[in-house]
Amino acid sequence: MASSLLRNPNLYSSTTITTTSFLPTFSSKPTPISSSFRFQPSHHRSISLRSQTLRLSCSISDPSPLPPHTPRRPRPEYIPNRISDPNYVRVFDTTLRDGEQSPGATLTSKEKLDIARQLAKLGVDIIEAGFPAASKDDFEAVKTIAETVGNTVDENGYVPVICGLSRCNKKDIERAWDAVKYAKRPRIHTFIATSDIHLEYKLKKTKAEVIEIARSMVRFARSLGCEDVEFSPEDAGRSEREYLYEILGEVIKAGATTLNIPDTVGITLPSEFGQLITDLKANTPGIENVVISTHCQNDLGLSTANTLSGAHAGARQMEVTINGIGERAGNASLEEVVMAIKCRGDHVLGGLFTGIDTRHIVMTSKMVEEYTGMQTQPHKAIVGANAFAHESGIHQDGMLKHKGTYEIICPEEIGLERSNDAGIVLGKLSGRHALKDRLTELGYQLDDEQLSTIFWRFKTVAEQKKRVTDADIIALVSDEVFQPEAVWKLLDIQITCGTLGLSTATVKLADADGKEHVACSIGTGPVDSAYKAVDLIVKEPATLLEYSMNAVTEGIDAIATTRVLIRGSNKYSSTNAITGEEVQRTFSGTGAGMDIVVSSVKAYVGALNKMMDFKENSATKIPSQKNRVAA
């Protein structure tokens, strides 16, 4: 049911504004919908185009016309337990596993597959596709990724390793192997805690018992036929050094090929973490026969620094996530770590390099942001909206004289195209061809149905705004392209509200079979009444946890983007990979439009669709190889 978050009349001003908007339908013509509601313009802007700010004209670039990406040095042949080039650092992306543990970041199986394909374009060495034992849905998603992305070899022979996480028990390990074994390069990643606090309070086991479990489970994983086994001593940052030397030496003898050293609670400083890697290299028997990895949490904001410190000390695999998402404060950010190595690898890191095609960073970041509903903060390094903005007069003067004065990364390196036309004006007279050309320049390749829907929405916005900028277009495309598979589609909505009585909403939805359903409801505000009407149709209990709205551009005619976070009933649950507890899933939804009520309802319906797509007992269908968005 709709939350009391939306029943506060103070959310809206006393001014009543009547607008007309058009909802995208699946016919050839738009459907007019009128609504009357109170609107308080937001003071928050996700993309600012202030005239006093010098902003580099950047747009998302489509790297597909460019020649094939060639790393600074060739990617070494993949061998599980060693790397032939001592300066090559493997990139292990765990967005689909650890990143999805972020509250509200639940992904559908199709979204996971889309992201995995994009990660392969990015060139990550290992994709940790999930925790197969967590749920039927997670198992099927990992299996599908192994069958598809894990078997797609490019012209250079590159194919990512597909990894599944498991706890140190036979059931988890068998489940992980059953999911990843279809990949050309499958990996099992198993872990058990080693710090005193975890041994005493969580595991309730002695050090000797944990060593025996770790040794036997690594041996069991190898016995299944898996030649690539990664082992992690959970909470290594707080574990006794001598104990780490012992347990890691035992799992090496049992057949581990990669040893991952996690700073699970993000407590270490860069100097400490680098010294930990140095000590492990010097004192662990047989460590020269495996690859050392790092996994740094961001609880103290040091995950990127710790990861780089670990690499400098000799670790040759980095576990990271797109946009740094993850449990609690998140993980080391792929884009930050990779660009730091690209910028400084030769100068201060002894020549370290990766095989990442950095031109795909922005598109990958955008896809993860839209699918998870987790907005990237404007000042986020590398991919934030302000990453290439200069407002200070001194900085502006320097930038105009020479870009290198205040810019250490060229926007083109990460998939942004520097152009005087970012913010190009399209208007109501612009045609379908002009819109399609601009979408291509922004990095989007849409099919005819998607283009038709976007075009009608674009025309609607253009009728009400003098200028339609890239920010507007990106918001519209994201609202169409990055939506979950539709169980319910919003067709029409009519709102009556004001100061003279309760708000009333009439909502029309279409189900998966195309059957139309209509419901009316009253509430203490326009959004509250609309959400209640949706609940009457869907009949799926849901609690609204968060509701937020941002204006894409400035002005009263700005497009609004809405994000909601909901929680369903107990049947939408899975197993937490770290604690082993059953946790209720949360689901996010986003919507965009000039009508804030319409965008709010679209976000709510999107979250419900994502929740209802999360089915414990349904097999994952493998979609077409064609991506909805080509980067």
Swiss-Prot record:
Pfam families noted in UniProt: HCS_D2, HMGL-like, LeuA_dimer
Regulation: Feedback inhibition by Leu.
Every Pyruvate carboxyltransferase domain range: 89-362
Compartmental location: Plastid, Chloroplast
Pathway in which this enzyme or protein is active: Amino-acid biosynthesis; L-leucine biosynthesis; L-leucine from 3-methyl-2-oxobutanoate: step 1/4
Transmembrane segments: none
Name of the molecule in the record: 2-isopropylmalate synthase 1, chloroplastic
EC code(s) of this entry: 2.3.3.13
GO biological process: L-leucine biosynthetic process
Cofactor(s) the protein requires to work: Mg(2+); Mn(2+)
One GO term describing the cellular component: chloroplast stroma
Family label: Belongs to the alpha-IPM synthase/homocitrate synthase family. LeuA type 1 subfamily.
Subunit description: Homodimer.
Phenotypic effect of disruption: Plants show an increased Val content but no changes in Leu content.
Gene3D superfamilies recorded: 1.10.238.260, 3.30.160.270, Aldolase class I (3.20.20.70)
Leading EC class: transferase
GO molecular function: 2-isopropylmalate synthase activity; metal ion binding
Binding site for a divalent metal cation: D98, H295, N331
Described purpose of this protein according to its UniProt entry: Catalyzes the condensation of the acetyl group of acetyl-CoA with 3-methyl-2-oxobutanoate (2-oxoisovalerate) to form 3-carboxy-3-hydroxy-4-methylpentanoate (2-isopropylmalate). Involved in Leu biosynthesis, but does not participate in the chain elongation of glucosinolates.
Transit peptide location on this chain: 1-57
Gene: IPMS1
